[in-house]
Amino acid sequence: MALIVQKFGGTSVGSIERIEQVADKVRKFREAGDDLVVVLSAMSGETNRLIDLAKQINDQPDPRELDVIVSTGEQVTIALLAMALIKRGVPAVSYTGNQVRILTDNSHNKARILQIDDHKIRSDLKAGRVVVVAGFQGVDENGNITTLGRGGSDTTGVALAAALKADECQIYTDVDGVYTTDPRVVPQAQRLEKITFEEMLEMASLGSKVLQIRSVEFAGKYNVPLRVLHSFKEGPGTLITIDEEESMEQPIISGIAFNRDEAKLTIRGVPDTPGVAFKILGPISAANIEVDMIVQNVAHDNTTDFTFTVHRNEYEKALSVLENTAKEIGAREVIGDTKIAKVSIVGVGMRSHAGVASRMFESLAKESINIQMISTSEIKVSVVIEEKYLELAVRALHTAFELDAPRKGE
Amino acid sequence: MALIVQKFGGTSVGSIERIEQVADKVRKFREAGDDLVVVLSAMSGETNRLIDLAKQINDQPDPRELDVIVSTGEQVTIALLAMALIKRGVPAVSYTGNQVRILTDNSHNKARILQIDDHKIRSDLKAGRVVVVAGFQGVDENGNITTLGRGGSDTTGVALAAALKADECQIYTDVDGVYTTDPRVVPQAQRLEKITFEEMLEMASLGSKVLQIRSVEFAGKYNVPLRVLHSFKEGPGTLITIDEEESMEQPIISGIAFNRDEAKLTIRGVPDTPGVAFKILGPISAANIEVDMIVQNVAHDNTTDFTFTVHRNEYEKALSVLENTAKEIGAREVIGDTKIAKVSIVGVGMRSHAGVASRMFESLAKESINIQMISTSEIKVSVVIEEKYLELAVRALHTAFELDAPRKGE
């Protein structure tokens, strides 16, 4: 008999019919003998409706009061699911974040979980009840309602699994697992049976938005086995876990991630003096613009070029900040490009394999795709290319790294 | 500087515009120097929407879980009002029933308030904040969310006023006070400046649905001065208070209430033996049918007739129960009538005035209105008449008891 935490997102509980389907699924697990804690999001669209109500009062609504409103979304779904389970003869009880009690810090709208009281949940599980918990919300030490920020229900699921030392945290979504790359781009993409936390982090942050990145970090930190599954289709999904078996048979790379949401900015002819990177990125950061890749090459003629990428939505803003900076520090010019794409190969296997990057560059060269920027980490290599080559690049790499064929061990 | 509890109902907070108007009103009071606790209902229609969601899962939803859902309605409005106040530069904070903490028993969907912790509210008031509290909800000693039943926000307001020893509890509604009778029936109806708790109870239970009856009882018990006011019009409203000055100038009756929602049932030729009333009403009560008036006259020929009224919606059900009973106890026949109306005169003044009832009967006789049933209490006389005479009867009585003219002392 296992203890399983199951998390269903907004689409999975988006209507009464869907909630009834989730109840059927939960009942099946319960009848198989598992102890179950179910974490729910608000019905899809509901959180936006509530935020919109608040914004009709004030574009910048008071953060404490916003959490009071937004937290009602999950409060409705947990009670609906508990009712649906009770109707099926499955004893169940719902808890808000406050009732559990999921203690957070007091950063309204983006709170972090500090501690979970497992007392009530354990006693309900012992009494044979399914416990349905509101995701995305908690309470600070003064009893103020807090929320974890958008998508935070995944984090609630993982945190509960960690606190309860659950055997598995199952995240139900609208995909049946994590794939070697986006199947819409590469039809031969394969569902991965397993992936490590580190790989998943690189895949998620690079645009394979299956799981919320914070929840993966959290799961890795507390070593909670995470499984991504489809809400309404049968199948084993993908297990995200620690890297247990670094065997010969492990593929060199696990997947190919990509992202077309970025834009690139370059400031050229920057005097090559200490502190210049800060002078450039300081004002960007002060303007609340997030930077992804940063590349600076060695200087020549005492000047250097400095390039970074930002979200495409923030390109104009970043450009105007950077133009000011260029004047101040005496740089030659600022240029930018929004028609770029980032492609990354990810895999813990590359740690022990030399030549992974060169194999990547080689297969792009074969397709005559020019590489504009390169950055690397221990388990990934990312390149920026012209956007129109994105699909071609992903397909070429998918084949070059032997991801097309059904993989060994699967 | 007074401490005032203000309660706004669902219509008063039914849209963002209305909530902004309430915020303007609250700000004015605050700027005048009063300490304010504001109690809110859910937006009109929202509670029904939430109940409907629950009923889509189960016609008889689990009571605990229903409270979890339904309580979100007020949780949204309190935060919206707090935001609107903060936007206006008025420091404000919202609290759910659980956050206050309003402790209730565990009768879900119809809980009763046991105790209110005034600690947080007092410290907020001291800090100059307007405190916005969710009406209609509380929490039991195990932390389960409870609701007080439909319309319970009035009760929350009165209970808070009692706990805080507030100077006044103001109930904002869609009428500008309590009238001598329904102005739609008698255009000369007058707004009462004052009315006693007892009179208000009789008026409310008889169909002048301005205030929730439980809140009036509660206010009377704890002697909380209640004031009924219009949410969006200026005016002093009607003060409901204890009967301080039983002066000569006090009118004999304060108002005329009426009700067309009832139906009458008579069981005839009942053997006149002890216990027969219970044999008749026992099965009615067991069928969860509420009975209003009950009349039994003295027996003749060892049989008696027994008449009572029920809500018109329950007439058919009551009729079938009563026909079974008639067979069992050997009664002659069962007859009924749904085309009836009840008219009542209410006033503490009648205690010290003889002949009030006969004056009532006289003025009805003058209009040739036949009286079918009569029942009396210390401060009211009710009669049942044929429904079509209702307006005529109310107007005749309004004139007979001198309620048409502006009254002395106003």
Where are these regions (language model features)?
Chain A
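Nucleotide/pyrophosphate-binding catalytic subdomain
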Residues: 1-216, 297, 309, 384-386, ...
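A conserved regulatory-domain signal marking ACT and ACT-like small-molecule sensing domains
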Residues: 57, 237-410
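Conserved beta-strand segments of alpha/beta enzyme cores
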Residues: 91-93, 225, 290, 370
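Short hydrophobic alpha-helical runs that function as membrane-insertion/retention elements
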Residues: 168-172, 226-228, 292, 373
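Acidic-aromatic/histidine active-site loop/patch
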Residues: 219
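Active-site C-terminal subdomain of aminotransferase-like
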Residues: 224-236, 260
